[in-house]
Each structure stands twice: as structure tokens, then as C-alpha cells.
Amino acid sequence: MVYYVWSRGGYTPGMELVKGVFRGILGRSLPSSGHSQTRTESLSSPWVSYLWLTTAMLDLIFLYGVVVRLRSQLGQVVICDRYLGDTALDFSLNFPQVEFEKMRLWRLIIWVTPKPDNSFLLLLPVSISIERSKLKQEPFPDSKETLEKRLTVYQDGALFDEYERIDALQGIEVIEEQIKKKLGLLDAS
């Protein structure tokens, strides 16, 4: 059995539930999801940043440290679309004023999160990424500038040193073959 999970710190189903509860309690005083000046200003407040990061990290401790670990130990193949590196990148872009890496909860996440057997990073030029976001009708797409920062880190950043980088402009069959070879499902020749 295969278990698939998409996760980015602060945008998991668990975190969406928490944000929904806060919106219900606080009403209009809480900014809506997505990119906005109001949201950016709110998240720049030290206590709001700390609360948001703490909640997101607790959620990830449960998701990675309990759900992913348990399913893996039960013999399921677990596929994580986005993982710790993506979350670290998100946190650094969204909270440049916070040294989240020094937070005890962040160190706990790293400790409880299972290490992947294989990691892949499918790279696309920013222009194609923007095009695909429009086609998928992403509700809160990243700006061109943010995508450029992400791509630079994906290509050169130490966060992703252990990832197998794949040119996602290649055909689907070529990409599939590269992944299957890396997983040992095809002859490496």
C-alpha cells in the first residue's frame, strides 16, 4: 500500500483546521489565506510569527514524527510531496526576521522526522512554473521573485544536497525512467 502526503509547514490539513478555528474565534481580525499586505503585516509581528511557526511545527511533528513514521513502520510506501527542506525554505522566505532553525521545536522536527530512502527534486524554469500555476489555477501562487529565490536554493542550496535533481522539462517517460532507475526498479545500465 502507498501513502501519499503533500505537506508544507503551515499548509497541511491539520494546520488548515487550526487556522479555521482561529478564524471562527477571531472573525474578521484574522487575515484570510493567501498573499496580501494585511497578512504580511500580521506575520511580521514577533508574537504572531512565533505563534504561527510554533503551531506549524507542532503540526509537522505530528505529521512526520507520528503519521509518516507509523505508516512507514507498518510497511507502507510513503511518498512525501514536499518535505523538511521545502518547509525550511518556506520559513526562511516568509519569516526572514525569525531564526527558526534555533527553535527547539525545529530541532525536534528534524529529530523525529524519518529520513527518506530517496529524494527527488524536479526542476523547472520560473516561467514554466508560473504557466503551470495558472493552468492548475493555484489559489495563492508565489510571485516571480519568490519563485526565482526558490529555484536558486533548489539548484544550489545545501538544504537539497541529498536530492536527486531532475530536469522536469524532459518528457514524462524520461523522468519516470530516471526515478525508477534510482529506486532500483530498472537496470541502471
What function would you assign to each model-found segment?
Residues 17-23, 96-98, 138, 183-184:
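Short, hinge-like loop/turn segments at secondary-structure boundaries
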Residues 47-58, 92-97:
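Surface-exposed cleft-lining segments at the edges of enzyme active sites
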Residues 52-74:
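Phosphate-binding/switch loop-helix module in NTP-utilizing enzymes
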Residues 77, 82-152:
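A glycine- and Lys/Arg-enriched "phosphate-lid" helix/loop adjacent to the NTP-binding pocket
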Residues 1-4, 118-121, 164-166:
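Hydrophobic/aromatic beta-strand patches that form the interior of the parallel beta-sheet core
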Residues 127-189:
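NTP-dependent small-molecule kinase module
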Residues 1-47:
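N-terminal phosphate/diphosphate-binding loop that engages ATP/GTP or pyrophosphate donors
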